[in-house]
């Protein structure tokens, strides 16, 4: 990965959906028309003040934005070094950042006259957020979820059903997020006339990476304004977990042109990158095409996607959003691996020091924030995106620690 200077990171993607050599649209001919229709509808909606007003109103009165920035004082004192601040996306309605995106896409679906939405989910948070907005707008909702993830996220599966969604188990492949995304795409090809596909991460063919980023960018815009208002300065470093990378790009985007702010993504190193049991696509992957876009993917020498592992269902994905691949190649962001064990230690530490249960996904970011803080003096600030709450993961953590609930 060779770094190259970029004058304005906000100028990307280009008109074809490319972030440098990444992104684009590599899809079957049957999807070209629907994607063009979606891109046109989205670009029109972005310019419509009425659409923006409806979105902003829902963020304020339904989601509960703005989410606060919280100074984790006791955690910072325990760790030593820089002060750790948390962007509290766990306090949103449904308990994670995912609803920022599903609200926007569901409003777009209604604007396009679609009556049915489909979604893929790993940890279940995107599925819950999709089912939530479908219920609010009176739309049919079908969620595809890997059978492996259904087993480790039973609470979220039940939440989706309570909200009126149909949850379809996916047993192909590793029965995790990538397989759920495959099945959702097949559904969309078949039912495109009345169906809107709400992708939950900044992956997929254009316009999805930019659309999902734009709907999540409220996180970084708020955080930047809050930092200046409350601290009179920007953070020295920011970090977020990266699977597909929607919460991360949501935080990162507002800071991309602030060159003094270090940006670090926390990938899922699983049992350790050297073991092969991980989901660190940038740290250990290579450029390839997955789910309609060119990005870093985990594959073998023949280009076949390999199975991934993470204690976190939401990070268990063999690719990454193309904008993250671009940021890595240009040197604007670093992407480092956090192991399962490091994430679990961070989970327990935040619970004990601050009374907050972070999602396992967010625990990876927290572990990275702790590492960054230890390297820095006390007068510096590390801002961590706490992308979701950990209620959904209690059974997984208990089982891993030999407890039966």
From Swiss-Prot:
Q: Which residues carry this modification: N6-(pyridoxal phosphate)lysine?
A: 98
Q: Which organism is it from?
A: Stenotrophomonas maltophilia (strain K279a)
Q: What is this protein called?
A: Tryptophan synthase beta chain
- Report the protein's function: The beta subunit is responsible for the synthesis of L-tryptophan from indole and L-serine.
Q: Which domain of life is it from?
A: Bacteria
Principal EC category: lyase
Cofactor(s) needed by this chain: pyridoxal 5'-phosphate
Keywords associated with the record: Amino-acid biosynthesis, Aromatic amino acid biosynthesis, Lyase, Pyridoxal phosphate, Tryptophan biosynthesis
Q: Which family does it belong to?
A: Belongs to the TrpB family.
Recorded catalytic reaction(s): these are: (1S,2R)-1-C-(indol-3-yl)glycerol 3-phosphate + L-serine = D-glyceraldehyde 3-phosphate + L-tryptophan + H2O
**Which lineage do the record's taxonomy fields give for this organism?**
Bacteria, Pseudomonadati, Pseudomonadota, Gammaproteobacteria, Lysobacterales
Q: Which GO terms describe its cellular component?
A: cytoplasm
> Which pathway is recorded for this entry?
Amino-acid biosynthesis; L-tryptophan biosynthesis; L-tryptophan from chorismate: step 5/5
Q: State a single Gene Ontology molecular function.
A: tryptophan synthase activity
SUBUNIT field: Tetramer of two alpha and two beta chains.
What Enzyme Commission number(s) appear in the record? Answer: 4.2.1.20
Keyword Mitochondrion tagged: no
């Amino acid at each position: 990965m060779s770094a190259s200077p970029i004058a304005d990171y906000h100028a990307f993607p280009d008109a074809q959906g490319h972030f440098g050599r990444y992104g684009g649209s590599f899809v079957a001919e049957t999807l070209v028309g629907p994607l063009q229709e979606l891109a046109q509808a989205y670009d029109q909606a972005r310019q419509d003040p009425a659409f923006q007003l409806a979105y902003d109103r829902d963020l304020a009165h339904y989601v509960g934005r703005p989410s606060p920035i919280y100074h984790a004082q006791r955690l910072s004192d325990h760790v030593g070094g820089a002060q750790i601040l948390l962007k509290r996306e766990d306090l949103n309605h449904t308990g994670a950042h995912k609803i920022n995106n599903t609200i926007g896409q569901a409003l777009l679906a209604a604007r396009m006259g679609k009556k049915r939405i489909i979604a893929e989910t790993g940890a279940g948070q995107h599925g819950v957020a999709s089912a939530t907005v479908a219920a609010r707008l009176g739309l049919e909702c079908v969620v595809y979820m890997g059978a492996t993830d259904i087993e480790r996220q039973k609470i979220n599966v039940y939440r989706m059903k309570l909200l009126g969604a149909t949850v379809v188990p996916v047993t192909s492949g590793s029965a995790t997020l990538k397989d759920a995304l495959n099945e959702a795409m097949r559904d969309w090809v078949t039912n495109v006339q009345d169906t809107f596909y709400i992708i939950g991460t900044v992956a997929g063919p254009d316009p999805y990476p930019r659309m999902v980023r734009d709907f999540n960018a409220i996180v970084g815009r708020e955080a930047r304004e809050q930092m200046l208002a409350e601290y009179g300065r920007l953070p020295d470093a920011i970090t977020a977990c990266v699977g597909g990378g929607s919460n991360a790009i949501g935080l990162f985007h507002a800071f991309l042109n602030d060159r003094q702010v270090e940006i670090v993504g926390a990938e899922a190193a699983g049992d350790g990158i050297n073991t092969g049991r991980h989901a660190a696509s940038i740290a250990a992957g290579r450029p390839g095409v997955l789910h309609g876009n060119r990005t870093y993917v985990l594959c073998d020498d023949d280009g076949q996607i390999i199975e991934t592992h993470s204690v976190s269902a939401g990070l268990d994905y063999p690719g990454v959003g193309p904008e993250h691949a671009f940021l890595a190649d240009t040197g604007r962001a670093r992407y480092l691996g956090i192991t399962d064990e490091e994430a679990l230690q961070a989970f327990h530490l935040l619970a004990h020091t601050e009374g907050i249960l972070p999602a396992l996904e967010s625990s990876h970011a927290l572990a990275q924030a702790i590492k960054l803080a230890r390297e820095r003096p006390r007068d510096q600030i590390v801002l961590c995106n706490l992308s979701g709450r950990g209620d959904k993961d209690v059974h997984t953590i208990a089982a891993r620690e030999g407890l039966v609930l």
